[in-house]
Amino acid sequence: MKTAIFTVVLALAVFAVLSFGWEANEKALSEGFTELIHEKEAASETEARECRYFWGECHDHMPCCDWLVCRYKWPITYNICVWNRTFPEK
């Protein structure tokens, strides 16, 4: 009986150590992924957009793209760019 209890306690200790190692590895991966996302986000912010895209917030100083129009939609409390039922010419 003592051997069985000792084996169970030892197995639980091994599982605890393995899960701690897995958590540390997962945290390192998530930090690396977060850094990568922030780098991509910073790179995209440097590019100036000349128009707002679909469902983007729009005002007079932030116009929508050519195939979109700025409209007020009820559940949203600000104007958004919606499709004006035309297609952009290439």
From Swiss-Prot:
Annotated GO CC locations: extracellular region
Leader sequence residues: 1-19
Tissue and organ expression note: Expressed by the venom gland.
Main location, first listed in the record: secreted
Propiece span(s): 20-50
One Pfam family recorded for the sequence: Toxin_12
Origin superkingdom: Eukaryota
Function summary: Ion channel inhibitor.
Name this polypeptide is given: U7-theraphotoxin-Hhn1a 7
Classification lineage: Eukaryota, Metazoa, Ecdysozoa, Arthropoda, Chelicerata
